[in-house]
Amino acid sequence: MSACRLGVLAFGDSITNGGGELQWGVALQSWAQWVARGLALPYTGVAVDGARVEDVLVEQVPRVPAGARYDLGCLYIGVNDVRRLDWDRAAFERGHRAALAALAERCDRLLTLTVPLDLGRPRAEGKVQEVNAAIAASAAAAGALVLDLRGFGARNQVMTDHVHPTAFGQIAIAERALDVLAADGMDVRVRPHTLISYETTRWRRLRGDTTYAYRRLKQALKAANVHMGAV
């Protein structure tokens, strides 16, 4: 890696922006930031909550000078696109290709991520297959590495909305990303899970289970109301 490189650059939405509640005392940080820490590289994150692929192109790309050069460019987008009623696979794929092209102009390596199949409440269902096919096609055209998150979704790794990763979920994504990058020749200096420390007790587990059950019920009722309103 050249000394003039600027480290890791990340485009995306709230998942890549990070931030949120502690989990067993562990801060919720972006998976991309954990990747940068694992690679011992500087991090530049321009992801914005609620972003869609169009927002990446219009708002995020212009924030990074065209002459800048990074070791790794990360793109995780599509969750907000695919959950909209006006979802358009062809338009998304064009936008995703353009976003990867913008990263390629600035980065030595590219990494993009697919979307978990069990996405959202109500579920996005078949549309998730479409967004993942678009991401795969875009990545192949750009020569980007792909982190497959289709099966991602363990209870302690995803919030009850089945969209946003927990603090442990962000770390789990980063660990998988580092596996992909290591296989491609990048030097992983430290594993994110070794950088955290937490302690659980019977009472804290019970409180956590109760909170999870309450939030899951709220989410289920909200999803049911959405379905009823759509009828």
Roles of regions detected by a PLM:
Residues T16-G18, L22, E54, V82, ...:
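Short, electropositive, low-hydrophobicity segments enriched in small/polar residues
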Residues M1-A47, V61-R69:
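Serine-esterase "nucleophile elbow" of acetyl-processing enzymes
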Residues A3, W34, E59-V231:
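Alpha-helical cap/lid subdomain in secreted, periplasmic
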Residues A51-Q60:
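Structural motif
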Residues I15, V46-A51, I77-V82:
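Cell-envelope and extracellular/periplasmic
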Residues L9-S14, G38-L41, V56, L75-V79, ...:
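Generic detector of short, locally flexible boundary/turn motifs and exposed helical patches
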